[in-house]
Amino acid sequence: MKTNLKNAGIISLLAISLAVSGCSTGKQDDKEAVASMGASTVQSQQSSESQSITASQNSSGNPQNSVSKEDKTDSVVIDNFGVTTTYDKAPERVVPLSYDAAQILVALGLEDKIVGIATAEGSYKDCLPEYQEKLSKLKVIVEGTPTFEVLLSEKPDFVYATVYTFGKYGVAPVEDFQKEKINFYCINGTFSKEAKFSDIYKDIEDLGKIFRKEAEATKLIDSLKSREEALRANVKQTDVKVMAFDSGDKAVLTSGKGIEDEMIKLAGGNNIFEDLDNAFEEVSFEEAAKRNPDIIIIHSYDVGDTNGTTEEKIESLKKNPALENVTAIKNDNFVVVKLVEVFPGLQIFDAAERLNKKITELAK
């Protein structure tokens, strides 16, 4: 089935775990949603309205640090997304709102606590092979993103999701989760002003504390850090120019400041739109041509509205007259990545390694 690349891509980016599929009201609303989800805006709003909530029976301690563990009560205090939450015990009914979020929980050995999952625009097949079997057995509560009512029907005591979940076009605002006494953890790299790989490590560290899986979290963080360090040690920075292409037939939905920009730098490339303030923004094809990327990253989706459009996306770029003189187009220099590989999660270095291979070929 032929899809509208622009609309499907915008919806997908707002949906994945990411978490807004099916909640927008139209193409223009989707554009506004992308723009309104700038990290600095969300961070500012949450910081100014910081609230304190507790899980289970709250301790009376007054935490001095963003994360602490009190020896007497075994309570864990977490600061996340402008909200301070005390966990007297590990959550028991967990709902991640994407497979990449679920994958981190499974990597920590928490699959038995997951009572349901929303697929967003992903599939368990997008995830790492070692986790696919366990992920495939999770109960799917909705294809896409749930309404708040559907989420409530699972009686969760913990939700793990991106910033989009709590926005205008997401599941529900933070206050609604608090009213229902549902604790949550918002993926740091989706609302940080300038996302870094350290945001991924912070997520895992905090989840390890919340679920009393510190040893597993440390092991997972160490394995990711070793890959990051190997790339930094072996990758040579180049002048190769890179552009990410998610979708678009009237304009390019591309990556600005965000974790994908960090990934491109780590791989030795230069994001031609690193000057954009938001993680995802639309730019004209003419501006893309002017900046003339040597490589174009294609975001691939396995399921959802954009199913099967990887080749279609590439073909649309090749046929676009505005791009006919672009180096990447003329030389067929495309690198395909799964969307989950360019969001803050376990697979970000897979994308970096794949991109670096192409950059190295061009830099010879």
Which residues are covered by each model-predicted region?
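Structured C-terminal subdomain patch of bacterial secreted/periplasmic proteins
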Residues: 195-212, 216-218, 297-364
